[in-house]
Amino acid sequence: MKKSKRTDRKGSIHIQSTFNNTLITVSDAQGACVCWSSAGLVGFKGAKKGTPFAAGMAAEKVAQLAKDQGMKQVDVFVKGPGAGRETAIRALEAAGLQITSIQDVTGIPHNGCRPPKRRRV
């Protein structure tokens, strides 16, 4: 069954960037998921999923899918400490989507879970 083209010109893009992967989700004005992509879905495996280049490739793919659905303007919400945050936003802009706002929605713990131990390199 072929997906029907939506007429929503405005939507929101959520970028969740972790140290191991970058997930990008596009939703319409009502909040329903239109399409999504990740560094793993684009073809990267293992440690390469956490790189900025992989995040850029995932953002290019999701931007193309969103444009095929008729989306023009997007609000961007970024969550997480990963390396692909800025690269994904730049790739969305370069793909032709008009970004109206960028908002950081990273959760800040009020002394919740104990963080992982410090790395010794």
From Swiss-Prot:
Localization per record: Plastid, Chloroplast
Specify where it is mainly localized.
plastid
Alphabetically sorted, this entry's keywords are: Chloroplast, Plastid, Ribonucleoprotein, Ribosomal protein, RNA-binding, rRNA-binding
Record keyword Ribosomal protein present? yes
- Under the GO molecular function aspect, what terms does this record hold? rRNA binding; structural constituent of ribosome
Which Gene Ontology cellular-component terms appear in the entry? chloroplast; ribonucleoprotein complex; ribosome
Domain of life, per the record?
Eukaryota
The cross-references to Pfam families, in alphabetical order and at most eight, read:
Ribosomal_S11
- Mind listing the GO biological process terms from this record? translation
Q: Give TM regions.
A: none
Q: Which family does the entry's similarity section mention?
A: Belongs to the universal ribosomal protein uS11 family.
Q: What subunit structure does UniProt give?
A: Part of the 30S ribosomal subunit.
Q: What is this protein called?
A: Small ribosomal subunit protein uS11c
